Amino acid sequence: MEHDLLGLNPEKLGQNNRHMSPLTDRMVGEWLRRNHKDKFFIFVHYWDVHGDYSPPEQYAKLFDSDYKGSFKGVQQDIDNIKPGIKDEDLRHMIALYDGEIRYVDEYIGKLWDRLKELNLLENTILIIAADHGEEFLEHNSHWHGHTLYDELIHVPLIIHYPPLIRGQAHSTTSLRSSVNETVPYLSSA
């Protein structure tokens, strides 16, 4: 099995690569072009929606273009998200986080387009999920990994399961489901 660590490998990132989605996209694209005729499993993790909250400029202003404060979304600003923060600063930090989500969404779209370009959409199961959400003082706390509130665990799970490999039963549900059951089922498809 070929594997590689993307995003957190300093040798691949270079010195000034704050936004990892372009690098991830390029490396995944190269891998898919080399391997698209073989059966494959690929796990792609877009890291950009993790701290710092500093999306590229066009996304930084997307949800809060009138902000005049000093918060830029860097770690020092993130550390100041605590009770007592000014409402406009908190709104701006949430807007930066949302900007990062929108930025990564663009790269998920590029992955979809690449799968389509390589004629893989009709025989590839594609699962899009978030590893966690983020709490922004909804319960007087910030970050993730410390509670089980909806802000942290109510995350997207989108499954593209094409007709070519779909079994006899097919349904859509908005109920909670178990990854313990979903992953073995999908890997047998």
Pin down the residues of each PLM region.
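Catalytic domains that recognize anionic headgroups
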Residues: 1-189
